[in-house]
């Protein structure tokens, strides 16, 4: 019989009919024997099988083995690290303090097992972990916030929000990740404020969390589009694009907002999301009083592609001056897909439509427009003939290149 098994038999045995005090006296005696020392040696220095047996066996024996089990979290073999974490989880509350202190170990593999043990312990670990958010060691603060996130400890949210301002970037990054795991909407505002963090890793974690929070993030992110800080604007845009479909309806509604920066940012995001449901509303923005908003609407419609051509052609023919001009720019940006619809209006009753269509076809430079433009050289309107000639010259030059 091996030393581990002998010890456990002695440790767990009780005399039939003996009282509890007598059994615990036997335990205390055993702790002073060489058997106990040898058991600790087996736990920390034995071969893989011996260490594994020891780790799996001491869960019911309690506090005396916390130290060696903490050491087991640093073992070279994953099976020992995982077994040590599971056993510490069984020991429970007495292991919480030593586990939190062990976060000072820099290894990610060790930290993962500490977090696992604390998660297994659960409720008794919550308050000590929350208090550890104020610890003077950054690795302990980082580990504490990571564990609270994995445990989805909602009561810790105020403390984790404060940790978004921690001087250590690792703590700030883990705080953003933890808030995503917990999923509390009250985190959205502070997270958006952290979009301009000095560290890219923190900014990326914040964006990922805002995206995972979904709908509660949308309106605050849209408001962030007005931020004068270009980095915040860019990251808010990227977050909204990543959220995607759930943001479309809200973005469409904000195209009527009184703030030009919100209209501009919203139409930009809609173009990048690429949902064609937004086309009719974006078309309305083509005659927005703000030039910057109109420019973004043009870009958005061009990005939306072929489905935008029909409404753009309608605006090209029937819109007011501002809307026609914006539609022309969008059609030019669309390029060759717009060639056939433009060829079709070369015979429009309105000379202005024919002239502008010829101009655009020249700018697009598609060879298949040549014959149709050549026919326009006999147009009764001199301005149309001139534009057709210029368009043909432009196409010829591009072909020569």
What are these regions (language model features)?
Residues 1-15:
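Polybasic, Ser/Thr-rich amphipathic helices
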Residues 46-47, 76-77, 106-107, 136-137, ...:
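Short inter-helical turns and helix N-cap capping residues of alpha-solenoid HEAT/ARM repeat scaffolds
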Residues 12-32, 49-63, 71, 79-93, ...:
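Structural detector for internal amphipathic alpha-helices that build alpha-solenoid repeat scaffolds
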Residues 35-40:
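An edge-strand/N-cap motif at the start of beta-rich repeat modules
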């Amino acid at each position: 019989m091996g030393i581990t098994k002998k010890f456990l038999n002695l440790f767990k045995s009780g005399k039939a009919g003996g009282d509890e005090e007598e059994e615990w006296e036997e335990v205390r005696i055993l702790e002073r024997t060489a058997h106990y020392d040898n058991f600790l040696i087996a736990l920390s220095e034995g071969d893989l099988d011996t260490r594994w047996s020891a780790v799996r066996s001491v869960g019911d024996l309690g506090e005396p083995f916390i130290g060696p089990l903490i050491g087991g979290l640093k073992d070279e073999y994953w099976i020992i690290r995982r077994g040590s974490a599971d056993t510490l989880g069984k020991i429970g509350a007495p292991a919480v303090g030593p586990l939190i202190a062990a976060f000072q170990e820099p290894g990610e593999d060790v930290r993962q097992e500490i977090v696992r043990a604390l998660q297994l312990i659960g409720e008794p670990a919550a308050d000590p972990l929350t208090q550890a958010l104020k610890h003077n060691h950054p690795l302990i603060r980082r580990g504490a916030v990571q564990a609270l996130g994995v445990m989805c400890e909602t009561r810790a949210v105020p403390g984790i929000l404060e940790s978004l301002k921690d001087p250590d970037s690792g703590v700030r990054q883990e705080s953003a990740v933890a808030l995503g795991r917990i999923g509390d909407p009250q985190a959205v505002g502070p997270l958006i404020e952290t979009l301009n963090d000095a560290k890219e890793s923190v900014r990326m974690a914040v964006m990922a969390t805002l995206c995972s929070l979904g709908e509660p993030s949308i309106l605050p992110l849209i408001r962030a589009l007005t931020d004068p800080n270009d980095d915040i604007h860019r990251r808010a845009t990227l977050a909204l694009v990543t959220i995607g479909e759930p943001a479309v309806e809200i973005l469409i509604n904000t195209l009527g907002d009184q703030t030009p920066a919100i209209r501009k940012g919203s139409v930009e995001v809609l173009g990048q999301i690429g949902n064609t449901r937004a086309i009719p509303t974006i078309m309305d923005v083509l005659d927005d009083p703000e030039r910057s908003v109109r420019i973004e609407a043009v870009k958005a419609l061009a990005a939306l592609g072929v489905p935008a051509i029909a409404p753009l052609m309608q605006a090209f023919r029937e819109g007011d001056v501002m809307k026609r001009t914006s539609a022309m720019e969008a059609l030019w940006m669309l390029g060759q897909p717009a060639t056939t619809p433009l060829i079709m209006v070369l015979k429009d009753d309105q000379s202005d439509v024919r002239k502008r269509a010829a101009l655009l076809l020249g700018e697009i430079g598609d060879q298949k427009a040549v014959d149709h433009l050549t026919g326009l050289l006999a147009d009764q309107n001199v301005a149309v003939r001139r534009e057709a000639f210029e368009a043909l010259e432009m196409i010829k030059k591009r072909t020569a290149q």
